[in-house]
Design a protein with these regions (language model features):
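Active-site microenvironments that recognize anionic phosphate/pyrophosphate groups
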Residues: 1-247, 323, 338, 347-407
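Charged catalytic cores and adjacent phosphate/nucleic-acid-binding surfaces used
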Residues: 5-6, 27, 289-292, 298
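Short C-terminal domain-edge/linker segments immediately following a structured domain
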Residues: 196-201, 259, 270-272, 301-304, ...
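Helical scaffold of the NTase/Pol beta-like nucleotidyltransferase catalytic core
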Residues: 211-213, 243-270
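Hydrophobic faces of well-ordered beta-strands that scaffold small-molecule active sites
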Residues: 226, 270, 287-289
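Histidine-centered divalent-metal-coordination microenvironment in nucleic-acid enzymes
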Residues: 236-237, 242, 280-296, 385-387
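Catalytic or ion-translocation cores adjacent to nucleophile or general acid/base/metal-coordination motifs
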Residues: 253, 262-282, 291-352
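Beta-rich nucleic-acid/ligand-interaction surfaces
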Residues: 277-285, 363-370
């Protein structure tokens, strides 16, 4: 066996050791898992881990990972250095071309990762023992460790916090600005999966989703699932997706869904974009919410006025000191939060004010107004923040305009 293959075997051994330490790989499955990786490249001359001549170099790689812990938040829990060592060894040995490295790395990490059912079982054990937030932290750490969440890239994103606002520049995440693509949900060529966030993407090689793992979540008695974003905008950014491929919408049920989620995971927020082009998300064909473990600036924004509705004395509506038109509904009562929020939604989506250029529908009767809600739990109870959105365009505002507080 030549030295080049020796380096390949040593790098694979290092990845197996990493999976044993960080991906809950059962030692009884180590040989079986190693052989799956060997099969990718038709490797059949493995000398065994104790007889490789590259033990020192592999040890150095592992030490480099441990040593980087002070510089990177997740340190040794990220496999990037080991994957880099494998890719370098494999390309030198002629197993694949350099440009094929990312796909093979994704394949190997998918092999090393636990299957979805086992992962869900472990999540439920942690949740039963330590609570929903501890279970989410465990799941997030796992998704970092199996390289689905790209911590190495996220840690390089610029971030600016000042005057109650946060600006992040996501250098890695692809964005879709084309409205037709948004309406189609960024449909995939071939029709499978139906869109980029369908549950069928879990483990799908066609979009390099071999390491994607999801968790089932019940919202409003319906089947949804949670997954973390590989290129999140904030801490523990994830999406909660309807298991059925159904279009985005915001209605009364939406508010109950958001509260169901924060009841189970009270340290997270959950919200959604307005379900309209230009002011909505990049995937409108599939109903989904976004949330995570970091309160957004709007959740902490001060208020400049507050009032109550006569029929709901246990709920307070606060007008936020915010660049856009936004209010916050606060109550310890789930029912009051849902009722008051839906009253506001119905009023806004039908609101017209020609003097201020606000039209709820365009000339063809298409709806133009919508809400972007997000829910959190605080010591005050439930808090539902609502951003008033309108996607109207004109010759003067060809890409639309924000509905500003001063004009409403």
């Amino acid at each position: 066996m030549n030295d080049q293959l020796t380096e390949v075997y040593a790098s694979i051994d290092a990845l197996i050791d990493y999976a044993l330490a960080h991906l809950d790989l059962d030692p009884r499955n180590a040989d079986w898992t190693r052989n799956q990786i060997f099969a990718l490249f038709r490797l059949d001359s493995y000398p065994g881990p104790k007889t490789t001549t590259s033990a020192a170099s592999v040890s150095d790689v592992v030490q480099d990972i441990v040593g980087s812990r002070s510089q990177a938040p997740y340190g040794e829990k990220t496999p990037d250095p080991l994957l880099a060592a494998f890719r370098a060894a494999a390309t030198t040995a002629g197993l694949f071309k350099p440009e094929e490295g990312p796909a093979y790395a994704d394949t190997i990490m998918g092999i090393l990762s636990a299957n979805p059912a086992d992962l869900d079982d472990r999540f439920l054990l942690v949740e039963h023992r330590d609570g929903g937030m501890a279970a989410m932290q465990w799941f997030y750490d796992y998704c970092v460790s199996n390289n689905y969440v790209k911590r190495a890239q996220l840690d390089r994103n610029p971030r600016f916090d000042s005057h109650g606002l946060t600006v992040t520049i996501n250098l890695a995440k692809p964005e879709f600005k084309n409205m037709k693509k948004a309406a189609a949900g960024n449909a995939v060529a071939g029709g499978y999966p139906k869109c980029t966030i369908c549950h069928e993407n879990e483990g799908f090689a066609g979009r390099d989703k071999r390491t994607l793992r999801t968790l089932p979540v019940t919202l409003g008695g319906e089947s949804w699932f949670w997954q973390f974003s590989p290129y999140g905008y904030f801490d523990q950014h994830g999406i909660c997706v309807n298991t059925d491929h159904t279009p985005m919408h915001v209605d009364r049920d939406t508010f109950g869904h958001l509260l169901d989620f924060v009841d189970r995971f009270p340290g997270y927020f959950l919200g959604c974009n307005a379900a309209l082009p230009r002011i909505g998300g990049s995937v409108l064909a599939h109903d989904h919410y976004q949330g995570g473990g970091e309160l957004l600036p709007m959740h902490k924004a001060a208020t400049w006025a507050a009032f109550t509705l006569a029929d709901y004395p246990d709920a307070v509506v606060e007008i936020l000191d915010w660049p856009g038109t936004a209010v916050r509904v606060v109550s310890k009562s789930r029912q009051s939060i849902i009722d008051v929020t839906d009253i506001i939604r119905e009023a806004w989506v039908g609101y017209d004010d020609a003097a201020n250029g606000i039209a709820s529908h365009d000339a063809d009767g298409n709806r133009q107004s919508a809400l972007s809600p997000s829910a959190i739990i605080t010591e005050r109870g439930y808090e539902m923040s609502l951003i008033f959105r309108n996607n109207a365009i004109s010759d003067e505002y060809q890409i639309g305009r924000a509905s500003c507080r001063e004009r409403v």
